[in-house]
Amino acid sequence: YSDIDLMIISESIEKDAADIQKVITNLWDGGIEASHTVRELPDIQKYLSTDLHAFTQFFETRFISGDADLYNRWDNALHNSIDDNSKKILITNFVEDVRQRHEKYGDSPKMLEPNVKMSAGGLRDFQSIEWMMMISNKPLLNSQHELTQAEIFINHLKKNNLTTAAECKRLLESYKLVLSIRHLLHTTTKSKTDRFEFSGQTKLAAMFGYEETDLMSFMKNYFAAANIIFRVSHSIIKKFKVEFVNPVPDSFSYDLDEDFYIKNKVIFLK
C-alpha cells in the first residue's frame, strides 16, 4: 500500500505534456498506482531553496528508461547544487525536521504503540541520517549500484569507520525488521497505516511465528531494533551538528590519545 515513487524529468513539461499523460494513463490502466512528479532542470535550485521534503525526492533516483543524457545532466546539476553553504542549510533543516517529528510522533524508541515510520527509532530516523550522509558525501547521491539504498548507506558507514562492522550488521537487520513490520501492517489493514497498535502487534506476532502468549518477546525484538536505529541516528546527528549546524574550530579540539579526540562534547576517531 506504499506508493511507487516515479519522477519524470523533462526538458519542457509543456512540450512533453501529452507523452507524460500517456505514460501515467498506461500505468493506471495496468493497475500500477504510481505517485508521480514531473520536473525540469531548474526545479533543482527551486526546491533546494524552498522545500526540503520535495528536494529529498531527488535523492536515491535510479534511471529506468528514456533520455540517458538528460538524466546525466540532471544528476550533474544536482551534485553541483550542493555546495558548502547549501550543505549547512540542508543538514540544519534536517536536524530541525527530526526534532519536530519526534515532538509530534514520540521521541522514545520504546513507545507502546509507536508509529513505525515517524516515531523515534522508526524508518524515517534511518532515512534522515541516510539523506544527511548523502548531502555531506555527494557520491552517495543517486548511486546506480544493484544494492538497496540502505545497503549502500551502511556499506559507506563501515568503509569510512563511522561505526563498527558489528553495529552496521545490527543496524541493517533492525531496519529490515521495522520495514517488514510496516509492510505487514499495510497488508493486514489494507491501508497505509503506520501506527503499530496493540491489535496489530498481536496479529503480526503470530505472523512472525510467535505464540499467542509470547507477544512480549516479539515486541522486545521490535524495541531492540528501534533502539539501535535511534541510537545510531542520534550519534550521527550529533556528529553533523558539530560539523555543520554549530561548527567548532579545530583549535577547540582536545586529543584523548593517539586514536581519539574530543570536540564540542563529541568523540572522534583520528
Question: How should these model regions be labeled?
Answer:
Residues Y1-K270:
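A nucleotide- and high-energy phosphate-metabolite-utilizing enzyme signature
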